[in-house]
Design a protein with these regions (language model features):
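Short, glycine-/small- and polar/acidic-enriched structural segments
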Residues: 28-154, 160-162, 178-184, 199, ...
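Sec/Tat-exported extracytoplasmic proteins
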Residues: 77, 82, 92, 131, ...
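Secondary-structure end/capping motifs
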Residues: 221-302
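Pocket-lining segment of extracytoplasmic ligand-binding domains
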Residues: 86, 167-255
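N-terminal secretory signal peptides and thylakoid transit peptides that target proteins
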Residues: 1-18
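Solvent-exposed, polar/charged alpha-helical surfaces in well-ordered, non-transmembrane soluble domains
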Residues: 71, 75, 89, 125, ...
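Conserved C-terminal helix/tail region of periplasmic/extracytoplasmic solute-binding proteins
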Residues: 293-323
């Protein structure tokens, strides 16, 4: 089985690697591919889908966010990993040596604005003058800005309260914020615990695109580049398995992350779209550019930023053929 490394171990560069059994394909044979994973996700999914028989050595490093994955890539500690559209904007602004190589179709119904069950807030326009929690420099800040803009408001019209997810939950439960822009399993867990209401989801405000990125230097190595392409295809096939075995995956993932199975299964069934891996398109580049432009307006990154050079389309034909 693949070794799973901590972020600290990876950035220190001091970890051993385990070669996996060779598969039929020889893509990237003789090299080690270092892949980022989120808790309980990529390694377990690939294993369940029978996709871990890589012809190259494979190691996983566990990370809590895409921004940290970019940091690890820029430090030369990770070769490939996934993230939202937000980290590539900061990568472009900082000159980080990463490339966006594939587009992930993923759920946005799990990104919402919550309000307490008895709150008088009934529509996004009612957020004016209210204390609204969000996670700074993440999708929550982006879709909150877009939700406000759609009703003629901006961050200047609310009291924005940047909080970590854990601090946001505490503030929400204690009534210290009037609304909370949040994502992931914090949503159904908070709803189950307090009866909180979903004021609005990010569907229509987020593109539903996420990014698979690769270390620029890894792409310059023919064997590593081939291994990355093979890995992307395995991820794509694993997601197809997930859609066909949603209940099995709910059990596996629930056990791995310590979230009740019914909550995991409910979120999977409520997804805005099934997971898939697609080629980079002009529309996908434009979507990340829109994020960059919004974050420039919010003062989070200096402008101007052109995100187009961040994208590498070399795997487009490979991913399109496997559709």
């Amino acid at each position: 089985m693949p070794i799973i490394l901590s972020r600290r171990s990876l950035l220190a560069g001091g970890a051993g690697l385990l070669a996996l059994a060779p598969g039929l394909s020889q893509a990237g044979s003789g090299v080690t591919l270092r892949a980022a994973k989120y808790k309980g996700r990529e390694d377990n999914l690939l294993r369940a889908a029978g996709q871990l028989d890589t012809p190259y050595a494979l190691s996983f490093g566990e990370f809590a966010s895409g921004n940290v994955i970019v940091e690890a890539m820029n430090a030369g500690a990770i070769d490939v990993g996934s993230m939202s559209e937000i980290p590539p904007v900061f990568a472009a602004a900082s000159g980080a040596r990463i490339k966006a190589v594939a587009i992930i179709a993923d759920d946005v119904n799990n990104q919402v604005v919550l309000v307490p069950k008895d709150s008088p807030i009934r529509a996004p326009a009612d957020l004016a003058g209210k204390r609204v929690g969000y996670v700074r420099a993440t999708t929550t800040q982006y879709y909150l800005a877009r939700i406000l803009k759609a009703v003629g408001l901006s961050f200047a019209d609310i009291t924005g309260v940047p909080l970590t997810p854990a601090d946001g939950r505490a503030a929400f439960d204690q009534g210290a914020i009037d609304a909370w822009a949040i994502y992931g399993y914090s949503v159904p867990i908070t709803i189950a615990a307090s009866g909180a209401r979903v004021l609005v989801t990010a569907n229509g405000y987020l593109s539903g695109n996420y990014i698979y990125a690769a270390r620029a230097e890894a792409l310059e190595d023919p064997k590593l580049s081939a291994a990355i392409g093979d890995y992307l295809l395995r991820i794509k096939r694993a997601w197809a398995w997930q859609q066909a075995h949603i209940e099995d995956w709910a059990t596996i993932f629930s056990d791995a992350i310590g979230v009740p199975r019914d909550i995991v299964l409910g979120q999977l069934r409520n997804a805005s779209q099934p997971n898939d891996l697609k080629p980079v398109t002009d529309d996908a580049v434009a979507s990340v550019q829109a994020v960059a432009d919004t974050f420039i307006e919010l003062g989070l990154v200096p402008g101007p930023i052109d995100v187009a050079p961040l994208f590498d389309r070399r795997y487009g034909e490979l991913l399109a053929k496997s559709a």
